[in-house]
Each structure stands twice: as C-alpha cells, then as structure tokens.
C-alpha cells in the first residue's frame, strides 16, 4: 500500500481537519495489565479525551473496527465539554520536522496530562449522573414501601 503526501509533508486529510479546527489522535499503549487506547480530540481550542480498554494486544483489524464502529458512539455519549487549550495555531510544518515529531511521538508512549484531565472530567460527570439516578431509584423504592405499608394498615383496620 502506498500513501501519497502533498508537498507540505502532511496527509491531505490532516489539512482539512486542521482548517476546520478538529484534530484527532489515537494513542494505544500497554499500561502493565491491559492495552488501552486514548483518543484525543481537539475541537475549537478544547481538548476532549476518551479511554477505550482493548484488553489483549489489538490487531490492526480490531483498531480499525474500533475507529469505524465504536468511536463515534463513544464520542456521542460523552458529556464533557472539554479542557480549554492555551496556545496559538501552528504554521505549515517542514516535512523533516514533521518526521522528527512523528518519531518522537512514537517513542513517547503515554497520555498527555491534558488528556488525563479530560478523561477525569468525563469520569466525574458519569459518576454524578449515576449518583443522581441511584438516588432517584432509592427514593422511588422508599415511596413504594411506604405506600404498601399504608395499604396494609388500611386493610388491617377495615374489618373493625
């Protein structure tokens, strides 16, 4: 398979996303027990990050299946608004510099601190939502028990 790069040294789809202000990056690393994929999405100066647990080492087909089928659902279910990024827009990157940056990224296996912060915010939002749902369920069950108790008391005194 051959990939054709434009004269700027970047894949053409990257330029489209960069002009729109959207950049996505998938990092897959081994955390000591499982293989984890972290998707970082930069959209209009805000970073959102999503964590996906692959389990055993993913094959290329599994990664593609995740990107094509599960990634959009995971992004749609997210409730976080993202972490504001500070910085300016980059200019066109020299192809040699881009190649050095790519090799540096490949050596640096891990997640950025901003991505970790975004994942933490998403986790906190989910916790709060689940806590609220559980509280409503407990109150509903408590109300049902109270009504049943009232019914039994009325039934008991009805015959006198």
Curated annotation (Swiss-Prot):
Keywords: Coiled coil. InterPro entries: UCP021328. It comes from Bacillus subtilis (strain 168). Residues 133-146 have a biased composition (Basic and acidic residues). Residues 69-145 form a coiled coil. Residues 82-109, 129-160 are annotated as: Disordered. This is Uncharacterized protein YjdF. The keyword Coiled coil applies. Residues 86-99, 147-160 have a biased composition (Basic residues). Induction: Up-regulated by mannose. Is under the control of ManR. Is subject to carbon catabolite repression (CCR) by glucose. Forms part of an operon with manP and manA. Disruption phenotype: Deletion of this gene has no effect on mannose utilization.
């Amino acid at each position: 398979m051959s990939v054709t790069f434009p004269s700027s040294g970047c894949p053409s789809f990257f330029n489209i996303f960069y002009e729109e202000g959207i950049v996505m990056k998938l990092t897959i690393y081994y955390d000591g027990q499982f293989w984890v994929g972290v998707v970082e999405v930069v959209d209009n100066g805000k970073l959102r990050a999503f964590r996906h647990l692959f389990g055993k080492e993913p094959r290329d087909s599994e990664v593609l299946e995740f990107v094509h089928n599960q990634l959009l659902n995971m992004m749609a279910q997210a409730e976080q608004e993202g972490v504001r990024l500070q910085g300016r827009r980059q200019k066109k990157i020299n192809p040699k510099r881009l190649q050095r940056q790519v090799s540096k990224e490949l050596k640096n296996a891990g997640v950025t601190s901003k991505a970790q912060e975004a994942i933490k915010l998403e986790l906190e939002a989910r916790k709060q939502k689940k806590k609220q749902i559980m509280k409503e369920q407990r109150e509903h069950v408590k109300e049902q028990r109270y009504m049943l108790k009232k019914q039994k008391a009325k039934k008991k005194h009805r015959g006198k």
